[in-house]
Amino acid sequence: MEESRSTVKEFWKSLSEKLKESLVSVMPVSAIVLILALTPWVEISGSELITFLIAALLLVLGIGMFNLGADMAMTPMGQYMGQGLTASKRLGVLLSVGFIMGVLITVAEPDLSVLADQVKTVMSGTMLIFTVGLGVGLLLFLGILKILFHIDLSVLLMYLYMALFCVAALLIDSGKGSLLALSFDSGGVTTGPITVPFIMALGVGIALTVGGRGASENSFGLIALCSVGPILAVLFLSLFAKGDLSYTVPGYSFESFLSKATLEVFGAKAGDVGQSLILLVVFFFVIEFIALKLPKVKLIQILFGIVYTFVGLVIFLAAVEMAFMPLGYKIGVQMSAHNPLIIILFAFVIGNVVVLAEPAVHVLNAQVQEITNGEVTKTQMMLALSLGVGVSIGLSVLRVHFGFSLLYYLIPGYLISLGLSFFVPKLYTAIAFDSGGVASGPMTSSFILPLVIGACVTMQGESAVLDFAFGVVAMVAMTPLITIQSLGFKSVMAVKRRSAIAIRRIMEAEDDQIIYFE
């Protein structure tokens, strides 16, 4: 009896801590929207504002429960699988499990289904989903080999991005360049809040079991590689796309969302999240039954964690759809009609704070701080991510205003990112490339993307959305590569400065001991 009371008390303590963290995450976005409602730039009605505030409270609850569930289930599941299968020393089994898991999780990812629905006029949605799943499975297969054989992530990424831009050039040459931005956006879409904690923990489990020098830096990089797979897959599919390449803006009005029954929205999201989780959970318990044989206590903890993850993610996604999508579109349309400079500055500011509300970002930051033993803190990570996302969204709206190709950002951006990777500690490079896939989560696709689409409809017209509005997710995924590696570059410079000062002091001390004879 006393033990059960202690367990309940510990649960409420953990949940309250997670809710406090999520409240701090959601408050900045909510505060900015409330301030914006007082300005003449956006007209937000009383009912819309109340809906938004209710959604914000639901967001706090959803993020808090999701983060608790990730700690209790998603992260341990990945680590146990990584450690158990690696310790068995059956390479074929480990690689096969990695490949199958990559395909299954990606096929079930709700965000990918949304993407497939948006491009079904130009390519088969089913074909897109399974091709992207195959791409992620193959890249996860490659990522596991990278950890096992300590392959340099920088070199691997350099070759992959060279191949990626070669295929992009072929796509432009074929006259289907309008699908380029959509292809790059797919990389951020497929690394969703369910898959990120699991895949990251899988990498940690494998790396810790393999051991050796640089085990901590070797554990990162799986998310980075899995983000490249979907881009390559969609680029290849786009080469064979047929039909009308025009894009129709969905109904983003508050009325279209408020007309749905609340239970209908929650029911739809429960189905999406359940579809994503069930494959992962079944696959884990099959592996557990065959190979892991975990204690009963740990299995019960994982089951409770899965429930918290499910409930938290359903609440989060429903809240986002109810208020954040229509509000983002409305802000984009109305602010850009007033003054393009205002919407560009607003995009930068909102980008700095919206990343705080991404569920998987908190999981990433906690794992980074733990793996690096505090060398890279959660605060440093959050500041670097916030700055990167803010810059990326501001630049995306600037691109919408002037109407130029996404490649003018991506080519120099990735050249800088890959160039920095040869000058900063490998740990920072691995963390940076993983962060790109994590930062571009559901808040980006459900709030920021509608905002940019709204701005594009006003500035360039609906027909230009496919060319200029899409690409914002790709930008959000790219800029953290530069900002986080800049942290590493700063640390390298600081070490060199300290070494130079220490050497100079030693030399000065030796000079003082020299005896001069007349």
How should each PLM-predicted stretch be described?
Residues L140, I144-I151, L179-L182, V204-N218, ...:
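Alpha-helical transmembrane segments
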Residues E48-L53, L85-L94, V122-F130, L170-G175, ...:
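Membrane-interfacial loop-to-helix junctions in multi-pass transporters
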Residues D71-R90, V114-M123, D152, F324-N339, ...:
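Flexible loop linkers connecting adjacent transmembrane helices
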Residues L91-A168, I344-S421:
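Helix-loop-helix junctions within the multi-pass membrane cores of secondary transporters/permeases
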Residues M1-L68, Q83-G84, S88, G187, ...:
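Signature of multi-pass transmembrane helix bundles
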Residues L170-S178, V234-K242, F316-A323, G394-L395, ...:
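Hydrophobic alpha-helical transmembrane segments in multi-pass integral membrane proteins
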Residues F52-G64, M123-G135, S186-I199, K269-V281, ...:
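Structural signature of hydrophobic alpha-helical transmembrane segments
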Residues S30-V33, G62, R90-G98, Y159-L171, ...:
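Small-residue-rich segments of transmembrane alpha-helices in multi-pass membrane proteins
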